């Protein structure tokens, strides 16, 4: 449109060939390139561009969220997977580190405070303890599995015992947890839909085993092109963040 106003006509095929040459043949790739320019060059966006980026990548909506290093702020959410024959309803507890998108995921047959705490105890804390990192804060919505009466609610007690600050999203605005929203969208598209087409699962354990394999690839092999990772895998960003964390803690000492 702009070129036409200037009296220039460009063949759509020419535009397409340029996109292919620059690895920008899809709208998603073009948005990723735009996102990278924002953080690399300080590019100012129009309102429409911001809306498109936030729709393509919910994490972008959280671009002003401070996350200085691994463990600084994690996000947790419950995702309804569906029904498994002979088992019933399946729920996924998902936890994502906002510094680099390192993620954890575990399946349950219920949506309760016990399961919300279990993934932290079983998967999340052991990982950070192995790296000698403290989890400083976790962000959740206001679901009953996460919020309740102090000193009675199991999840709240678990966080208190482990000296983890509990932050919550604004009431009636569940989309303010963009990091975990992006992860659950990815796990639905790249794992669950494919897994259920290829295989008939008869137990939660069987599905969890395949999920663990997918998650290993997600964290260690899959490049993340979002603004925080810039093409690195979550574990690569995590390891780089450990160095940054140590430097920041030394400066603060």
Give each language-model segment a name.
Residues 23-24, 33-40, 49-51, 99, ...:
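Short, intrinsically disordered/low-complexity patches at protein termini
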Residues 1-72, 144, 152-159, 231-243:
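Basic, flexible linker segments flanking DNA-binding modules
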Residues 50-51, 58, 63, 162-164, ...:
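C-terminal domain-tail junction helix/linker
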Residues 21, 32-38, 69, 111, ...:
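Intrinsically disordered, low-complexity segments enriched in polar/charged small residues
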Residues 4, 20, 106, 192, ...:
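Residue-level marker of positions within ordered structural domains that often coincide
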Residues 9, 72-92, 98-212, 216-217:
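RNase H-like DDE/DDD metal-dependent nuclease/strand-transfer catalytic core used by mobile genetic elements
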């Amino acid at each position: 449109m702009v070129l036409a106003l200037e009296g220039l006509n460009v063949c759509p095929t020419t535009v397409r060939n340029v996109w292919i040459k620059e690895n920008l043949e899809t709208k998603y790739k073009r948005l990723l390139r735009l996102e990278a320019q924002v953080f690399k060059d300080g590019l100012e966006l129009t309102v429409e561009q911001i809306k498109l980026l936030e729709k393509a990548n919910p994490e972008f909506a959280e671009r002003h969220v401070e996350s200085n290093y691994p463990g600084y702020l994690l996000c947790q959410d419950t995702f309804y997977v569906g029904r498994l024959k002979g088992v019933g309803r399946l729920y996924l507890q998902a936890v994502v580190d906002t510094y680099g998108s390192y993620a954890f995921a575990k399946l349950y047959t219920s949506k309760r405070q016990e399961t919300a705490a279990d993934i932290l105890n079983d998967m999340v804390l052991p990982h950070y303890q192995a790296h000698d990192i403290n989890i400083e804060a976790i962000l959740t919505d206001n679901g009953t599995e996460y919020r309740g009466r102090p000193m009675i609610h199991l999840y709240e007690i678990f966080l208190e015992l482990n000296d983890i600050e509990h932050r919550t999203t604004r009431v009636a605005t569940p989309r303010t947890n963009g990091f975990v929203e992006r992860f659950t969208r990815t796990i639905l598209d790249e794992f669950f839909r494919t897994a259920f087409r290829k295989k008939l699962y008869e137990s939660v354990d069987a599905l969890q085993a395949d999920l663990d394999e997918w998650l290993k690839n997600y964290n260690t092999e899959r490049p993340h092109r979002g603004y925080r990772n810039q093409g690195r895998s979550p574990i690569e960003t995590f390891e780089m963040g450990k160095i940054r964390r140590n430097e920041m803690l030394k400066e603060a000492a």
